[in-house]
């Protein structure tokens, strides 16, 4: 699947299953940041991010309790909410159309959001630049739009593009760690394997490739289409045999 079609780049992204031992650790975000910093010491890696969901699966949160100051009514359309960090945009090769990315401090970004281009339009802004530094009210909390990114397909081309809003949050559960690399995946994994025990000694290392995960939905579709084609051919053959038998019967009369 091409980035031009999806709006997001899934090639050369390793997905690590997050460490469950840090679920109750209030410093889990700092621990991930330290792990990511160690990963990025290797020149093969571009960036990394921790998220609750990855491309190929739906984002868990949707919200229509959003309003714009100065406007009388709440928005009618539901907005998909994603929790990301400052590494997400570069890791998945999104375009920052206007404004800025999140910083490294979640506390400083607690009242800031990044939105997709279609979400900005729903909020009433005609261009991405117009949305920057504007305020929205999400669940009765005023937040400032600091950036606008391109629209992208979170689940696949058969699902319509969803307007999205992103907050700077580390997964409140163990989440998933996405690491973009250059070059050979085996060499990239050797580096991760060498540093994982230092940061997460009580957690096994489990990984897969983002592109493979995303394409599973299409592989299943291909399998079902193949089965349907086989049944169709079988039905045609049975019908043809029946017709041939009927013709033979009448020919003998």
Annotated model-derived regions:
Residues 5-7, 55-57, 235-238:
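AMP-binding (ANL) adenylation modules
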Residues 5-7, 28, 171:
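Flexible acidic/glycine-rich loop/turn elements at helix↔coil and beta-strand↔loop transitions
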Residues 31-220:
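Mid-to-C-terminal secondary-structure elements
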Residues 219-235:
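N-terminal membrane-entry
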